[in-house]
């Protein structure tokens, strides 16, 4: 009898447990599945409880429901990052196509911009998608551990290449302003590519220690299951070598370039001593040369206090510096928060809130990635050649419809009878016209200056200066 009573008691307790479990299940379904409003209230109440008591979520919100809500929040972040990835890849592909196909854009500075676009495009292809994947997995590394060091290496490589390209552009423009003749003589396409190779070599050298040491010791690239640089020495040294030092060089040379342009503009306005003699004219038949080389003129300048550059060429340089300055500014503004926070994470480990630092780094790194997507937008807004090329490429028109060449001469030579095929005019000996100079500002491309936007680029080392004196 005692045994039967114990069995009945056990069965009744089991029945009561099942009934209580059923009631709890119904309560759970009512609280979290009855509507959007109840879910929000339960979640807000949980957050308030955590803030008031600083306790875990046990008893107030079940872990499956919390994970579902948290995953939904991260999906919105992943959606935003997907938009950034698409803009980065598509925009930089357009930049690469424009420099490759448009002769007007084929000069040293735009070659650097094309190489920069390649780095940004590879960042969008190889680095950003993996970063989005880690967001979906709660910043845990979901791929094989050996790929972590490779991913960080590519991230550092392309980010370093971006700042190195901007630094090289700033240095190249400054040299072109300070010594235009020397820069024009030694600034060929081959030398521009050699400079680009040097930039990539430096970037590879800075980022190479990551896979070398990371593949040997996982602790240098893993921290609590997350794939990130855990070596504090490399974080400090890498931040200064890969960002702050090139940033300092870039900013100094850019402001020196602006100062030099302002100084030359002042000299050109105050001193009309740019004495330019028209030595010879040459009109060649269109069948023998391309339209870009149809009209050539040799120009000889007399030495004066200011004879290197005219107001139009200085104005073109200032426009180019304006566009580059916007690119520099956006890059600095978008990457500085990440690198400053990265340094703070190492320096103030004990005094700073670790969770806050990690959250800021996760946000700031994507703000830095965003700089790779905005460069094509800057080119589109401020450069009509890029804007026209992008518009045609989107419409699958890869060649520009060339308009027939119309040659107009205004007040440059006296009216003479000449053949339509060829006219040559040279200076006469002991003629007063030999001493006649052009004091007006003539629109010309000075030695060492990049081609303006609406002038076709010439790959030859000979400088054919265009003149339009009105």
Swiss-Prot record:
A motif (NPxxY motif) lies at residues 375-379. One of its GO terms (biological process) is G protein-coupled receptor signaling pathway, coupled to cyclic nucleotide second messenger. Serotonin binds at residues 155, 342. Glycans are attached at residue 38. Its main location: membrane. One of its GO terms (cellular component) is caveola. The lineage of its organism: Eukaryota, Metazoa, Chordata, Craniata, Vertebrata. This is 5-hydroxytryptamine receptor 2A. The keyword Transmembrane applies. G-protein coupled receptor for 5-hydroxytryptamine (serotonin). Also functions as a receptor for various drugs and psychoactive substances, including mescaline, psilocybin, 1-(2,5-dimethoxy-4-iodophenyl)-2-aminopropane (DOI) and lysergic acid diethylamide (LSD). Ligand binding causes a conformation change that triggers signaling via guanine nucleotide-binding proteins (G proteins) and modulates the activity of downstream effectors. PROSITE patterns: G_PROTEIN_RECEP_F1_1, G_PROTEIN_RECEP_F1_2. A motif (DRY motif) lies at residues 172-174. Keywords: Behavior, Cell membrane, Cell projection, Cytoplasmic vesicle, Disulfide bond, G-protein coupled receptor, Glycoprotein, Membrane, Phosphoprotein, Receptor, Synapse, Transducer, Transmembrane, Transmembrane helix. Disulfide bonds join 148-227, 348-352. Residues 424-470 are annotated as: Disordered. It is found in: Cell membrane; Cell projection, Dendrite; Cell projection, Axon; Cytoplasmic vesicle. InterPro entries: 5HT2A_rcpt, 5HT_rcpt, GPCR_Rhodpsn, GPCR_Rhodpsn_7TM. The PDZ domain-binding motif is involved in the interaction with PATJ, CASK, APBA1, DLG1 and DLG4.
């Amino acid at each position: 009898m005692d045994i039967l009573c114990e069995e009945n008691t056990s069965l009744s307790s089991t029945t009561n447990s099942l009934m209580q479990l059923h009631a709890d299940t119904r309560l759970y379904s009512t609280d979290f599945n009855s509507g959007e409003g109840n879910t929000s209230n339960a979640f807000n109440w949980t957050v308030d409880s955590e803030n008031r008591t600083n306790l875990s979520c046990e008893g107030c919100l079940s872990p499956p429901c919390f994970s579902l809500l948290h995953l939904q929040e991260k999906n919105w972040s992943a959606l935003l990052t997907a938009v950034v990835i698409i803009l980065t890849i598509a925009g930089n592909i357009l930049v690469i196509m424009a420099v490759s196909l448009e002769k007007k854009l084929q000069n040293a500075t735009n070659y650097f911009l094309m190489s920069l676009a390649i780095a940004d495009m590879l960042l969008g292809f190889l680095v950003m998608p993996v970063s989005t994947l880690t967001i979906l997995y709660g910043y845990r590394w979901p791929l094989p551990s050996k790929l972590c060091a490779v991913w960080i290496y590519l991230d550092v490589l392309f980010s370093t290449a971006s700042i190195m390209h901007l630094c090289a552009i700033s240095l190249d423009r400054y040299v072109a302003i300070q010594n235009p003749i020397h820069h024009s003589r030694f600034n060929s396409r081959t030398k521009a590519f050699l400079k680009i190779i040097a930039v990539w070599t430096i970037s590879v050298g800075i980022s190479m220690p990551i896979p070398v040491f990371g593949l040997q010791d996982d602790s240098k690239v893993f921290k609590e299951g997350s794939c990130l640089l855990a070596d504090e020495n490399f974080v400090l040294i890498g931040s200064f070598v890969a960002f702050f030092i090139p940033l300092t060089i870039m900013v100094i040379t850019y402001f020196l370039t602006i100062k030099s342009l302002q100084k030359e503009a002042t000299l050109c306005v105050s001193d009309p001593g740019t004495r330019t003699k028209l030595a010879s004219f040459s009109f060649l038949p269109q069948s023998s040369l391309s339209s870009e080389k149809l009209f050539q003129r040799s120009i000889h300048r007399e030495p004066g206090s200011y004879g290197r550059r005219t107001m139009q060429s200085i104005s073109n340089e200032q426009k180019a510096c304006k566009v580059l300055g916007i690119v520099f500014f956006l890059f600095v503004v978008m990457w500085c928060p990440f690198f400053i926070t990265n340094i703070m994470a190492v320096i103030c480990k004990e005094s700073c809130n670790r969770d806050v630092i990690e959250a800021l780094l996760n946000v700031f790194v994507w703000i830095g990635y965003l700089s790779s997507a905005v460069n094509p937008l800057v080119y589109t807004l401020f450069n009509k050649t890029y804007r026209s090329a992008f518009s045609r490429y989107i419409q699958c028109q890869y060649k520009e419809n060339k308009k027939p060449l119309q040659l107009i001469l205004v007040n440059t030579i006296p009216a003479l009878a000449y053949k339509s095929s060829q006219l040559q005019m040279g200076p006469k000996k002991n003629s007063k016209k030999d001493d006649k100079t052009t004091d007006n500002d003539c629109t010309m491309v000075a030695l060492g200056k990049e081609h303006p936007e609406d002038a076709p680029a010439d790959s030859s080392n000979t400088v054919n200066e265009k003149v339009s004196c009105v």
